Swiss-Prot record:
It is found in: Cytoplasm. The keyword rRNA processing does not apply. One of several proteins that assist in the late maturation steps of the functional core of the 30S ribosomal subunit. Associates with free 30S ribosomal subunits (but not with 30S subunits that are part of 70S ribosomes or polysomes). Required for efficient processing of 16S rRNA. May interact with the 5'-terminal helix region of 16S rRNA. This is Ribosome-binding factor A. GO terms for cellular component: cytosol. One of its GO terms (biological process) is maturation of SSU-rRNA.
Length: 132
């Protein structure tokens, strides 16, 4: 049975170290020119696999390219992690696009459009009432 405390501790450590690696050790213009952050890390109970969810304000194609670049660099990142943290085995890394931010922004945009539409309809009704 997996030790949830250990998984949480390893997840926290991985998030901290991977963030530092992304900021300081990767020399990738695409990553440096776009703000990216780790929104969530999921580590399996046996600590063999780790999914890293990346959020970014970049547009769709650029987001995909960022994730592709990170997945291409995952062995290098894993190597650096192995040097920095004491674990028998560093988990296999997989970078995923966290679309929660983009979905949230699209919901806010829809709500704003709905609010504007309602406001415009109310203005027209008031204008019609004034003309009567």
């Amino acid at each position: 049975m997996p030790n949830n405390y250990r998984i949480a501790k390893v997840s926290s450590l991985l998030k901290k170290e991977i963030t530092l690696i992304l900021q300081n050790d990767l020399e990738n213009d695409l990553l440096r020119s776009n703000f990216i952050s780790i929104s969530k890390i999921e580590v399996t109970g046996d600590l063999q696999f780790c999914k890293i969810y990346i959020s970014s304000a970049a547009e769709g194609n650029i987001r995909k390219e960022i994730i592709e670049n990170l997945n291409l660099a995952k062995n290098y990142i894993k190597h650096i992690l192995g040097q920095r943290i004491e674990m028998r085995r560093v988990p296999e890394l997989t970078f995923k696009d966290d679309t929660a931010l983009a979905k949230g922004l699209s919901v806010l945009k829809l709500l704003e459009e709905l609010n504007n539409k309602t406001h415009n309809q109310n203005s027209q009704v008031e204008e019609n009432n004034d003309n009567v």
